[in-house]
């Protein structure tokens, strides 16, 4: 790499560092200044103020991540014009950041680098969390920057991510947690199909479950790792939080449906809170949510993402019997992950 190119890279990185300092500070100012904000109004406003290159979808995902953490309800009300000014500055800075990231991307890709670089993303997350003075918690900062990075990648290449479907399952949620909302997601029917899509080049990366803290290993994924030449690029640990999803209030629910595994993980809660409800196994959690949407008195046990995707109300969160229910998902692809070198690297052996 020539000296001129190295200088250009460093200039872009320095600019991004300066922007990140400002953005993290502004996000913390924003979160304590507008406790009574209506989410839909805020999302519409930031989209209206967006002049690109970030998509409206990406900016709304960024603000949704911020607001999911909870704006301070005790915050002293300030002039709406001040809040609007904060939002405008945040949006403009994020768009400037993406432009600099795009310049870096062009140089790196011209030299054969991948669009998705988990090691580099980990460094970014560590950096922005180190800049965070609070009150926003670091997980929220990571969620925000997950979407910033996702939007940046999408402007360079709309990566295709395949996952074990159907849509709005926990595997889908794990994929979005890792890659952000701005990429192209495609559900498959089987774990074998996930591997096949990536091997054929129809997808850039795949997401499959590998083990659950209560149910144990997912042997089909392990078998495919033995058979396939694909590599493990990254991993995602997802706490499994089941929600009771229904258009009917809790007292009117007569039937609860979901996959047998999900129902089994919520047996005690259902017995205590809906002792007279009929419990019915179904083919998938996503299908159960669709039924709950269309049928009065029916609830589904599924993820919050399912409720969001299908537009159904969440009547209760965290209905699982154990709070330590975690599933580990693998990100698979054709290229090997670069080691972080910070003691957190993992090597997996399949025998």
Predicted segments, located by residue:
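Domain-level signature for soluble enzymes in the chorismate/prephenate branch of the shikimate pathway
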Residues: 1-351
């Amino acid at each position: 790499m020539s000296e001129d190119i190295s200088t250009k890279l460093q200039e872009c990185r320095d600019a991004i560092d300066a922007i990140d300092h400002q953005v993290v500070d502004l996000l913390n100012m924003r979160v304590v200044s507008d406790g009574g904000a209506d989410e839909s109004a805020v999302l519409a406003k930031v989209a209206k103020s967006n002049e690109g290159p970030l998509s409206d979808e990406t900016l709304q995902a960024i603000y949704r991540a911020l607001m999911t953490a909870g704006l301070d309800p005790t915050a002293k009300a300030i002039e709406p014009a001040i809040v609007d000014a904060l939002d405008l500055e945040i949006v403009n800075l994020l768009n400037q950041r993406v432009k600099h990231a795009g310049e870096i991307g062009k140089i790196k890709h011209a030299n054969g680098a991948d669009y998705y670089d988990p090691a580099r993303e980990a460094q970014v997350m560590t950096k922005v969390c180190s800049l965070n003075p609070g009150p926003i918690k670091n997980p929220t900062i990571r969620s925000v920057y997950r979407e910033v990075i996702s939007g940046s990648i999408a402007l360079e290449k709309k990566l295709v991510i395949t996952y074990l479907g159907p849509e709005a399952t926990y595997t889908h949620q794990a994929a979005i947690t890792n890659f952000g909302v701005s990429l192209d997601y495609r559900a498959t029917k089987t774990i074998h199909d996930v591997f096949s899509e990536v091997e054929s080049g129809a997808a850039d990366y795949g997401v499959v479950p590998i083990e659950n803290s209560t149910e144990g290993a997912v042997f089909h994924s392990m078998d495919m790792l033995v058979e396939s030449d694909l590599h493990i690029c990254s991993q995602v640990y997802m706490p499994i939080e089941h929600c009771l999803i229904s258009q009917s209030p809790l007292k009117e629910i007569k039937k609860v449906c979901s996959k047998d595994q999900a129902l089994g993980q919520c047996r005690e809660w259902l017995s205590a809170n809906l002792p007279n409800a009929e419990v019915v196994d179904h083919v998938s959690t996503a299908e159960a949510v669709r039924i709950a949407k269309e049928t009065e008195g029916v609830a589904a046990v599924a993820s919050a993402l399912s409720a969001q995707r299908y537009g159904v109300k969440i009547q209760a969160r965290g209905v699982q019997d154990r709070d330590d229910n975690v599933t580990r998902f693998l990100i698979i692809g054709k290229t090997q992950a670069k080691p972080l070198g910070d003691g957190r690297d993992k090597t997996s052996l399949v025998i």
